[in-house]
Amino acid sequence: MAGDSEQTLQNHQQPNGGEPFLIGVSGGTASGKSSVCAKIVQLLGQNEVDYHQKQVVILSQDSFYRVLTSEQKAKALKGQFNFDHPDAFDNELIFKTLKEITEGKTVQIPVYDFVSHSRKEETVTIYPADVVLFEGILAFYSQEVRDLFQMKLFVDTDADTRLSRRVLRDISERGRDLEQILSQYITFVKPAFEEFCLPTKKYADVIIPRGADNLVAINLIVQHIQDILNGGLSKRQTNGYLNGYTPSRKRQASESSSRPH
């Protein structure tokens, strides 16, 4: 894992023109995506930096759930709405936001309330940063979004661990009861993971087993990001193979006609 990851990371270099370096982080529900991102930020010493000065920021796909109709919200409150389907997300807004980030613009991120299943009126302001981590269960599903990432990480955690984490999270943070959580998992979450999320694992440049517990993989990624922040990497290679690996943009060209399921 360590050797392969290190060689792969060497091929993902800072984009031309000093644009923000976008990293996509995908994986199943409660796989540890947020924890991996938080660990990266912590190891970079960015977790207590003033938001105006942050070099590394984290965005969540969960912020971009679509505004539900009254009928959809009623289903959601009963645990009968599929939040793990690609159509549950505002993919146009995700692409627009990430595109503006690559252009160095300040963006406004929606705030989603998981208790009321609605988008709040306030937004979160994200200022230009050198590195942006975008995490979500379907971060790699849309090709136009996927193609914006210079690096793609997949957090690979076993199903039992993910389910136990989801139960604890949804009870403590989202006010759900156990019966509703398990029903939703069996009806929507597990089938959607197998149909929409798991097939996108093939797009990952680095797979991280055990999530935030895998410090070997995370330290390699952190070192790579540190090199970017310190200007230690040369401009991105775009002409063929590098150290025996194909740069991600070259691979993505061959992925264009494929669908993740």
From Swiss-Prot:
Q: Where does substrate bind?
A: D84, Y112, H117, R166, R176, Q184
Tell me the keywords, alphabetical order: Acetylation, ATP-binding, Kinase, Nucleotide-binding, Phosphoprotein, Transferase
Q: Which parts of the sequence carry N-acetylalanine?
A: A2
Q: What are the EC numbers? A: 2.7.1.48
Q: Which InterPro entries match?
A: P-loop_NTPase, PRK/URK, Uridine_kinase-like
Task: State a single Gene Ontology molecular function.
Answer: cytidine kinase activity
Describe how expression is induced or repressed.
Following crush injury to sciatic nerves.
Region of interest (Disordered), ranges: 1-24, 240-261
Gene Ontology biological process? cellular response to oxygen levels; CTP salvage; feeding behavior; protein deubiquitination; response to axon injury; UMP salvage
One Gene Ontology cellular component annotation held by this UniProt entry: cytoplasm
Supply the SUPFAM superfamilies for this chain. Answer: P-loop containing nucleoside triphosphate hydrolases
| Top EC category | transferase
Among its keywords, does the record have Kinase? Answer: yes
**Pfam families noted in UniProt:** PRK
| List of residues that carry Phosphoserine | S254
User: What segments bear the compositional bias annotation Polar residues?
Assistant: 1-16
* Sites where the protein binds ATP: G27, G28, T29, A30, S31, G32, K33, S34, S35, D213
The subunit structure is: Homotetramer.
- Its family? Belongs to the uridine kinase family.
The entry's function note states: Phosphorylates uridine and cytidine to uridine monophosphate and cytidine monophosphate. Does not phosphorylate deoxyribonucleosides or purine ribonucleosides. Can use ATP or GTP as a phosphate donor.
Q: NCBIfam families per the record?
A: PRK05480.1 (NF004018), udk (TIGR00235)
User: Which protein, by its recorded name, is this?
Assistant: Uridine-cytidine kinase 2
The organism that produces this protein has a lineage beginning with: Eukaryota, Metazoa, Chordata, Craniata, Vertebrata
